[in-house]
Amino acid sequence: MFQIHYLNKISQQGTALWTEDFALTDDMETADGIVLRSANMHDMELPGNLLAVARAGAGVNNIPLTTCADKGIVVFNTPGANARSVMELTLCGMLLGSRDIIGGVNWVQSIKDDPDVSKLVEKGKSRFAGHEIAGKKLGIIGLGNIGGPLANRARKLGMEVYGCDPHISVEAAWNLDGHVQRMKTPEEIYATCDIITVHVPLLKETEKMINASALAKMKDGVIILNFARDLLVDDEAMADALASGKVARYVTDFPNPKTANMPGCIAIPHLGASTEESEDNCARMAVRQMMDYLENGNIVNSVNYPNCDMGVCQSEGRITILHHNIPGSLGRFTAAIASENVNIAGLMNKSRGEYAYTMLDLDHHPSAEVVEHLKEIEGVVRVRVIR
């Protein structure tokens, strides 16, 4: 029986999926799998028997990915499970940035006890006037699970939509509205659009991509939205751009001491994925991926090892090997198995950067000698006997 430990409260829509082969444990030291949302694992001592970590959400900055990979711990996330929630809040952000709705609501609260509140509203509402989004040019950097559907919704709202994503998948491209105009570089987006939103992962090359240089290339009075990652935007440069009027409004889902006190910034309390539907979807996806890996050895939506799926084992035995991506490894694995007079019924080998994963279905249950032989091969991190 597999032991599962939660580091955060997980939706019952997900926890109800565990079968009788899984049991919850309060002791992380005994856990085969950990499921979490936002808990920080960087300072945790990872137990030696831990096999997998599933993040009920997309971001994995709270998980030590390389450390996990080196220990043979597969880390999963749930891309797309919260995409609709984030996309809808981004649409809301466009409206909040284009019309001073928040300022108007706050003003009404300040005069709510005045008996002439209705007259005051009619007299003072003009100070909160804004602009329609229909007809405006929307630039979307990143056309994945959030950016793609956002582009399609914005088109239906009458916006001119421009998208930039050099890594767009074939599926995402096929699903994109035919009227979305493709831009080759973010710089083309900067020069063209009235509203700009970023939907890219936080990587070394994307950190502070919205900086002083990028802002200087944008239209005066541009509205910028960030519902992806806090550090995609240089806060110091943004504060200067808001003060000068270069940026009319900055809407972010990531408040910090700088943005929470930044004039012209609307800081939303990280509500992008905070819907019941999103939390349910993420939990279901995380649990299913965890169960499939622990029971069958299949890897789907890992962020530190390659995806590799051979379905449910139909043979008498299955071995999986987490290893470093060293040339010739597969040959050494098959030779080790053949030396024990074991026939391979099927195999799959995938690599991802420095790491690789091999699944081997065998004609009979592997012996302890076969397993030990595999463990001794250079670069092997972990060997599991699934069946």
Sequence positions of predicted segments:
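Rossmann-like dinucleotide-binding domain for NAD(H)/NADP(H)
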Residues: 220-313, 357, 361, 372, ...
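Oxidoreductase and adenylate-handling cofactor-binding alpha/beta cores
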Residues: 87-106, 154-159, 285-298, 334-338
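A conserved regulatory-domain signal marking ACT and ACT-like small-molecule sensing domains
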Residues: 304-387
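Rossmann-like adenosine-cofactor binding region
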Residues: 39-44, 166-259, 274
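An N-terminal-biased, well-structured beta-alpha scaffold segment characteristic
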Residues: 1-79, 211, 216, 223, ...
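Phosphate-binding beta-alpha-beta segment of Rossmann-like dinucleotide-binding domains, i.e.
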Residues: 79-137, 171, 301-303
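Hydrophobic/small residue at the entry helix of a nucleotide-binding pocket
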Residues: 146
